[in-house]
């Protein structure tokens, strides 16, 4: 559960992401594919090379979904229900991959916003991404 302080930290941090959400999403995906090569198995039809239009497009989807989640911190299950259905029933993504992408997102955010990435903000963003991952895997049962 996100505390009021966590919610403030997440909203403030995400306000600095702003228009870069898609770019950061794509960078985090690239970082994940390079650091955890087994994650590529879910994207056999993608060109996974650096700067790929497909990775950029998927990164935008990731960024947009997280922006939506930030706007609905009090109702993540409602805000992410359709995305949860997609990942559970159609894509069948192994839940561990959400943790890997979350880690890569944290690295990307820290790299681009070092002055704002305090230990408290890091902890709040980690809790937020963990909650998002939990919601996205909640329908796997």
From Swiss-Prot:
Positions of post-translational Phosphotyrosine modification: 24
One Gene Ontology cellular component: haptoglobin-hemoglobin complex
Keyword Glycoprotein: no
InterPro entries reported for this sequence: Globin, Globin-like_sf, Globin/Proto, Hemoglobin_a-typ, Hemoglobin_oxygen_transport, Hemoglobin_pi
Binding site residues for O2: 58
Modified sites of kind Phosphoserine: 3, 35, 49, 102, 124, 138
Record PTM Phosphothreonine, positions in chain: 8, 108, 134, 137
Residues involved in heme b binding: 87
Pfam family membership, one: Globin
Biological process, per Gene Ontology: hydrogen peroxide catabolic process
Tissue/organ expression: Red blood cells.
Positions of modified residues (N6-succinyllysine): 7, 11, 40
Keywords: Heme, Iron, Metal-binding, Oxygen transport, Phosphoprotein, Transport
Domain named Globin: residues: 1-141
GO molecular function: haptoglobin binding; heme binding; iron ion binding; organic acid binding; oxygen binding; oxygen carrier activity; peroxidase activity
Assigned protein family: Belongs to the globin family.
PANTHER family: HEMOGLOBIN FAMILY MEMBER, HEMOGLOBIN SUBUNIT ALPHA
Function, in words: Involved in oxygen transport from the lung to the various peripheral tissues.
Assembly and oligomerization: Heterotetramer of two alpha chains and two beta chains.
Protein name: Hemoglobin subunit alpha
Taxonomic source organism: Rhinoceros unicornis (Greater Indian rhinoceros)
Gene: HBA
């Amino acid at each position: 559960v996100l505390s009021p302080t966590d919610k403030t930290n997440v909203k403030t941090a995400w306000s600095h992401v702003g228009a870069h959400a898609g770019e950061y999403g794509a960078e985090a995906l690239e970082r994940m594919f390079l650091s955890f090569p087994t994650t590529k198995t879910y994207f056999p039809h993608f060109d996974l090379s650096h700067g790929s239009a497909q990775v950029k497009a998927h990164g935008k989807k990731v960024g947009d979904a997280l922006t939506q989640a930030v706007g609905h911190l009090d109702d993540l299950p409602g805000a992410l229900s359709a995305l949860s259905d997609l990942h559970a029933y159609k894509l069948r993504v192994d839940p561990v991959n959400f943790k890997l992408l979350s880690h890569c997102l944290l690295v990307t955010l820290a790299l681009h916003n070092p002055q704002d990435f305090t230990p408290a903000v890091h902890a709040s963003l980690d809790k937020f991404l963990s909650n998002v991952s939990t919601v996205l895997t909640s329908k796997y049962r």
